Amino acid sequence: MELRVLAGAEQEQTYYVWSQAFERGDREMRQWKEWGEKIKEQTFTVGVFDAAGLQATVLVMNTRVHLGPEVIVAMGAVGGVACLPATRGKGYAGAALKGALEQMRAQGIWTSMLFPFSWEYYRRFGWEWIGTQRRCVLPTNILRSDPETEHVRAATPADRAAILACYTQFAGQYRGMLARDEVAWNDILDHSKKEYTYTYLYERDGDLEGYLTFRGGKEEETWIREFISRTPRAQRALLGLLRRHEMQVNKFRWNAPDDDPLWSQFYHWDIEVKIMPATMGRVVDVPGALQAWKPARSAQGTVHLAVQDECAPWNSRTWRVEFEDGKVEVRPTDAPPHVRMDIQALSQAYFGTPTVEALRAADRLTVEDETGYTALRALFAGPMMWINDDF
């Protein structure tokens, strides 16, 4: 078995593997190739070879995520995890994932996320579920009119900057929201070759307070790609707009963060809300990730944190973590640990959901010193986790 980052013509070989794994043998792989061309400057693919050639792949896209209002960190978005059937069960995909972790660390990518085909499989390699979200389904015939809807209008290309600013302000309320680049925004807001994209804005006093956008859909149910409201009146206004679609759409569906105020705006027996995990996340490099984080400026303390990480051995040791005035310093220590946790639990604490308190209640960490535990709580206090993208 040989593992390496693919280069040049080797990249074409990935489509054979991905087609078998994801597209039932499609030879064109048109959408994959078009998307790959758009993001090629920010991705790398780790391949595993044996005597028969390329057998397994992991693709990593170097992107960035918000961690509250002040911090944006590099994040390795993992996808394209695939292995040809004849060599499954031999550890090839796992080797590719470990190789991807090494490459991310070498490139200064301290965190990672992925959307799993199996939660348990990726947990073996250090990723863990992070964040919860609500999937909302609302029938249009139960929605109410609202006078604020008179301040809603269709977006134009000139509104792009205001939409991005609205999203950025909203994203700063959470840990995990993508700091989207132009490619991502084009994919969300531009028309596709087949369908128009409809984007509507709520604006008051020259300030864009919310927007929603969708493309395509069916009469029975239409998926709203993004429904963001920074104020309660913006949410009421946009819900009122959805009511005006009653003749075209029976139900609208969208994802929202777990603190979404929908139920304070409107509730009805026919509203369906499903609670689910948001995604899986991982700390790739403990000192790099922790020093990129900014705790509250009023918080200060020291914790000796023992981390266990079987797939990234550079993380497995005890770290002295000191923080004050919004800055974190991390260095190895031989002192007895205050708190012990595996990389999965640390990753959850880092992204904010579940909280340190919830992890302790679930026996996901071991406390040896209460003062150190109190410092750990203060270190990771802050916004909850949410992401409204996939990859």
Would you name each region that the model predicts?
Residues M1-A7, Q11-E12, Y16, Q20, ...:
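Intrinsically disordered, low-complexity, positively biased terminal segments
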Residues G36-A56, A77, D187-L201, A299-G301:
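A short helix-loop-beta-strand connector motif used in the catalytic cores of GNAT acetyltransferases and
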Residues T14, A21-G47, Q55-G79:
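N-terminal, Lys/Arg-enriched amphipathic/low-complexity engagement segments
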Residues T87-G99, R233-A237:
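Conserved acetyl-CoA pyrophosphate-binding loop and the N-cap/start of the following alpha-helix
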Residues G47, G53-T63, M75-A77, A82, ...:
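Conserved beta-strand in the GNAT
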Residues A106-W110, F115-R134, D259-I275:
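Conserved active-site alpha-helix within GNAT-family acetyltransferase domains
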Residues R64-I72, L138, K218-E226:
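A short, polar/charged loop-to-alpha-helix boundary motif
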